[in-house]
Amino acid sequence: KIVPTFNTYGGKTTAGSTITLTNLSKGEAYLVASKEHEREDFMVDLSGTTICSDKPIAVFNGNQQTGIPNREAYSQDFMVEQSIPIEQWGTELYLTNLENTRINYALVTAAYADTKVEIVTYNAETGSSETNSVLLDKAGKTTPPIAINDSKRKEVIIRSVDPGKPILCYHYITSAAVNKFCTSTAFDDICYTYGDPASAMMPAWTHRVQSMNMFTEPLDPQGGVKTPQHFFAYVITKTEDTDKLTLNGGAVTATFYRFHANNDLSYAHIPLPNTSSYHLIESSGDGFIGTV
């Protein structure tokens, strides 16, 4: 059963109605798309759509054209990502600005009705903090976008106040476009300071791991022409375990680490080679969470 949170393409289903599929074959796919909309309508969103099945399924979500948060990005890419079941959600998440990005946003979705989410934002430059609470009154309800701006170094802690009500956090980012990609017009050159959009489901702290494999592939057509592109791995671990984290068998440089607003934890943006290459991050401590 699928219960979309927005009217679907072609007016086939209205928000809140149930789509029932009774005879999907192995390997068969079913697409639910939001209704047609104007270019400026950024509120078209299927966030919080509920999907239930009596047999194992894989669910992928994404969008057709993405400018997060700016249409000025020179590559408004398609984005598709596999969703995870509620069993893999959590109640405590830690976010920071990501290296080589312009503006970041996070969205938090509730698994159950009446989930109270606490959002603590720290300005690491001034030491000030701000706490906000959002009540998500329905299962699948999503918070307004949580801005994590690059103008100040920010650290964010997101918690579900009720430990029995897990949440899921999507982190949306726009790369810095340090290559200043330009196009010529009849009147002037237009240069774009925002790069490709991307998204990632941020792992909850309870789902930390002992190892993480990754692969980097330089794909920017302007990479190396003006300013080389950069790859980073973002990891967060217990402060006492920073010396137990390794990248490809070697210790992670201590100067990469910063204390998170929760001083029991530290995070690092680890530079990776600008080459087609595999990498392995491992911990002999209590584990870590990370994205690339």
Language model regions located:
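Extracellular lectin-like interaction modules
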Residues: 1-292
